[in-house]
Amino acid sequence: MFFQTWSDFFNMGGYGFYVWLSYAVSLVAVIALIVQSVKQRKTVLQNVLREKQREERLQQANKGNTL
């Protein structure tokens, strides 16, 4: 094993703060990207459903207006 103790592992030879901070920043960025993607997908699906319902209402309204 490269590190003798768990404390050495977390300290990373004096660079632990920077190593774990970079992991934390990366994790926050990935989680933010996932949350944003899920929200955007939900918004797009709602817009598609709204547009589909609008088109169906227009077709129903125009159904009786044909010659």
From Swiss-Prot:
Any one annotated GO CC term: plasma membrane
Residue spans crossing the bilayer: 17-35
Keywords attached to this entry: Cell inner membrane, Cell membrane, Cytochrome c-type biogenesis, Membrane, Transmembrane, Transmembrane helix, Transport
GO biological process: cytochrome c biosynthetic process; cytochrome complex assembly; heme transport
Entry membrane topology: Single-pass membrane protein
Superkingdom in the source lineage: Bacteria
KW DNA repair (keyword) present: no
Main location: membrane
This protein's record includes keyword Cell membrane: yes
Coiled coil regions in record: none
InterPro entries linked to this entry: Haem_export_protD_CcmD, Heme_exporter_D
Family: Belongs to the CcmD/CycX/HelD family.
Role this protein plays: Required for the export of heme to the periplasm for the biogenesis of c-type cytochromes.
Protein name: Heme exporter protein D
